Regions:
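Non-heme Fe(II)/2-oxoglutarate
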Residues: 1-92, 204-207, 212-220
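Catalytic core of non-heme Fe(II) oxygenases with the double-stranded beta-helix
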Residues: 69, 74-207, 215
Length: 221
């Protein structure tokens, strides 16, 4: 069983914001990307894609996931990019956005592969941040480890955003109380403007309303 860290006991480098979006927008994103079955996902045999680079690593049969890459310039721009526009206004200079869906694997919470999102050789000085937005409620977690070895466990609460230094080692933990654990991973540069999300009420609501109508058999239909 995971011992979640009280958000009041987190260091300043880790930022947690609950109720980050309006409920309708969160419900739409969760329905479309986790529940609807309408999104094409690439099946990755590692949550970090690191098997080829470290073939002698400890095998973890549960360490796989579905991935939908939304944004990674200059080559990847999914049509879904427009549905994440409110996030891009808050997280400046977003380098990467992808939706991860993990599958239930047994009745024990298990850690996925620990990693940093970018290699320092690619980003000298490591001046970037990672953020995770949880699409649904579940008893999984994100484990974050600072350079001093201190470990924090962030519970996967729907509509929660957690942001932290991208060079800090982190990993997800599997959920045992849902079939699918959905989260959106962002890598960005610059200072985030969290307050702007509250100012985008109409934008969030319009995306949610139009998006739900475009999906087959939306909730409540």
């Amino acid at each position: 069983m995971i011992e979640y860290t009280d958000v009041n006991d987190l260091p300043d480098e880790i930022k947690v914001i609950d109720d980050f979006c309006i409920p309708e927008y969160n419900e739409f994103l969760n329905y479309k990307f986790v529940e609807s079955g309408q999104i094409p996902f690439a099946l990755s045999d590692s949550t970090t894609g690191g098997y080829e680079e470290t073939p002698d690593r400890e095998d973890k049969a549960h360490d796989f996931q579905g991935v939908h890459l939304v944004l990674r310039p200059p080559f990847v721009f999914s049509p879904a990019i427009y549905e994440f526009a409110p996030f891009f206004n808050v997280l400046p200079l977003t380098y990467k956005c992808k939706v991860n869906v993990n599958f239930r694997y047994g009745d024990t919470n298990l850690p996925y592969d620990a990693h940093e999102d970018l290699q320092e050789v690619d980003i000298p000085g490591g001046h970037y941040r990672s953020a995770i937005y949880y699409l649904n409620d579940n008893n999984g977690a994100t484990e974050i480890r600072n350079p001093n070895g201190e470990v924090y466990f962030i519970k996967s609460n729907a509509n929660r955003l957690v942001s932290f230094p991208g060079t800090w080692t982190h990993c997800g933990w599997s959920a045992t109380d849902v079939k699918f654990r959905g989260a959106v991973n962002f890598i960005y540069f610059g200072e985030p403007k969290y307050d702007l999300m509250d100012q985008q009420y109409e934008s969030q609501l319009n995306i949610a309303d139009q998006g739900m109508m475009s999906l087959p058999n939306p909730k409540g239909a």
